[in-house]
Structure formats: C-alpha cells, structure tokens
Amino acid sequence: MNIGAHIPSKNAIDEISYRKGDTFQIFISSPQMWKSPKPREDIEILQDFDGNIYVHAPYLINVATPNNKVRHPSRKLLKDTCKVASTFGAKGVIVHGGSVGEGGDTVSYTHLTLPTNTVV
C-alpha cells in the first residue's frame, strides 16, 4: 500500500522522507493563478525519487464549461501542467473537471474528453 501526503512543493523529497511516505502530491504552480508552471530546478532530485509523485493542477481550471474565455485558458494550463509534470516522471496530474453550468452533460462530456485526449 502506498502512503503519502499533499505536501509543499519546496523540498518535497525531504518532506515526504521525514513523513516516511512513498507517495506525494504537489502543486507545481500557484493553485489560484492562471500562470503556467516553469521547469523545476530540482528535476533530477524528483526523477531519482523511488516512489510516486502526483501533481495537482491549479484550482482555476474548468474544462467542462461552455464558456470559451474560461475553457481555452484552462486547456492550455492543463496541458502546460502535464508537460512539466512529465519532465520529472509524475505518475499523474489530478484535475477537477470544473462546472458545466448551462449546457448539460453532453456538452460537458465533450469538453472534458477533448483536453484529456489531446494531452495524453
């Protein structure tokens, strides 16, 4: 069984080692801003970690919305987050799909699957 925690991004390996965990989740950019993550300075340390790393995407992402002014930047931010996460071997990116609002399930399903199929 994997044991882990959502921990601060800075000194993540030291933090999870202190907690005796083998799995952790971090933010790689501010969770409440539209700014894309930058390449990690500690990429080699993260790549050498013998455990599971997950990245939590920013909270602002809403790929389910029919509003293009929100959905399009959400797709870009999700793609950029996945790209940086892949550079150090993250096992996955956790993302909340967002709110559909008006438009129904069919619209939201299309909006949710398009960016994930594009990123993957």
Each predicted region: which residue ranges?
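N-terminal pre-domain/capping segments
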Residues: M1-A57, I61-D80
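Alpha-helix C-cap/termination motif
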Residues: R19, T87-F88, T113
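Flexible, active-site-proximal loop/turn residues at the rims of small-molecule/cofactor binding pockets
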Residues: S30, S99, T116
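Hydrophobic alpha-helical segments and helix pairs
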Residues: L78-Y109
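Conserved small/polar residues in nucleotide/adenosyl-binding loops
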Residues: T110-T116
